[in-house]
Every structure is written in structure tokens, then in C-alpha cells.
Amino acid sequence: LDNTAVFSPPISTLFANLRRQIDELDTSTTKVVVFGGGTGLSNIIGGDSRRRDWARNPFTGLKQVFPQLASVVCVTDDGGSTGELQKDLPLIALGDLRHVLVASVRRDHLRRSYDLDRIGARRCAAVLHALFNYRFISRPESAEQMVRESGAIVADLPAELRRVVDDLTQRLFSDPRLIPTLERPQCLGNLLVAAAIYKQIDPALGASELLASHQVVRTATIRGLAELAGALGVQPNTVLPCTTTLSQLQMLYSNGVMVTSEDKSSKARRGYPVDRVVVDFSRTPFL
């Protein structure tokens, strides 16, 4: 086959025409909801916020086209930092939510909320990018050290947003329920999301009580995400989990073997095709 046919000019022309048609539309009242996982959603909504060069052009993607854009994010990815976090906290997988949350930061929201100019908004997004993507292996000695080693220039944050970041990072070292998470390799962004959720929960409730109090965790998750989103320059309640019920992905292979865990299935080399994919919920799911 002629490889040049794969990326033929007509295809790029079609995309260019589509973009031109969308640009000509009034999308101010168009409500758009996008479903998916962290990487895919992040890319189309505002660019892959895990990329090192994302901060150079953070205000791009569908969020610039549709003001009333919302994302519903899958929460079964239990690999990496998220998997480590779930060893200590009875929360849904937060990694993809964090990924999409950063990608959803809007210039107009930052400017309106904090009276920033265009350069100030871009610098603010760059700080959030550094903070939410920073990963550590050994336990940080303090919140200040953790923020400093992230490389984030926190002086570029508006005072009000800086107070939000300070509050959440300090909670990681003061809330007895969150302190154990610092002993494992973590992504700071996931910890900040967890701290925002636990901020909504009665300090007297530990892991065992929260496992039995799914309504409490559900409410705290939605409220915590909304409050954090608003502070980050994201419209509240526009980055939502597909469920707040603890769940795991299960892959059934054609040879009858079932693998539980999205992370494990991604590393499995069974030599057989996947016959079925199901989600195993810890209880009747709230969707």
C-alpha cells in the first residue's frame, strides 16, 4: 500500500473545514458533555496536561470552543500513584480526574476570578501544571519542601489561590488520615485532590467508618472537586467522576482467565484476546 494515502490531504482538509464551521457557530449556549479516560479527555479538552510542554500553551482544545463543556471521567485506573493512594484512602481512583482537572483550567475563569491579565493567567496555569504533576518517591519533610521541590513558582499564583494550595498541602501533614499517604510514592496532584475531598469530611471519621458511609464520601467527593475546580479556574461541577462508588475493571480473556485491576490487565501478556470487560463495584453503584 502507498503510505502517503494514510494521511492524504483530503482528510486534513475535512478537519480544517470542520474547524471553520465550528468557529462560525455561536457556541455560547451549546452544552457539551464528553465521556472518557484521563489521557483521551485531557488531550481533546485542553491538551495533555501531563506533558512537560503543556504549560507553554495551556489554553487550547474544546474548552476554548465550548464555554459550557463538561467531562465525565472514568475512575477505574488503579495504577501508579492512584493505586498507592487507594491503599490508604477509601476513595475512587483520582489520577484521571486530576489529569482532566488541570487540562480544564480556563484563561477566562482565571482572569475573572483573580483579575489577571493574559500573561498572569498563563503563569498561573504553569504553576498549577508543576504542582499537580510533581511526583516524589521518599517522604517529604514538610509541605514547604514538597512545594519547593516541585519547581513551581508559587509567587506567580494569586494570593487567594496560594492560600488554597497552602491549606491543602498543610492538610497532608496535619490530617492523621492523610499522613500515611506521604510514606508511599505519590503524585502531588492526586494528594491535593484527596485533601480537597477530606476537607469536606468530619475529622472524626476514619477509613473503616468511611467505607461504611458511602453517602458521606460521595457528597464529599462532589463538593471537594467542585470547590477545588473553582479555585483552579475550572467551572465547578464540570469535571465529574462517572461514579463515586469504589470499583475495579475486570478483563475476561477468551481462555476463561479473569484479571481484576486495570493496572494489572495493562501489563498482562496472556496471548489470548479479551472476551469481555466488566466493572466490579464494591456496592450498588451511584452513577
Language-model segments: residues:
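Short, flexible/disordered intra-domain loops and linkers
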Residues: 46-53, 206, 210
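Non-transmembrane, aqueous-exposed alpha-helical and coiled segments at domain scale
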Residues: 1-34, 39, 48-67, 71, ...
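Electropositive, gly/pro-rich neighborhoods at or near active sites that engage anionic ligands
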Residues: 61-65, 74-286
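Short N-terminal binding/cap micro-motifs at the start of the first secondary-structure element
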Residues: 40-45, 79-82
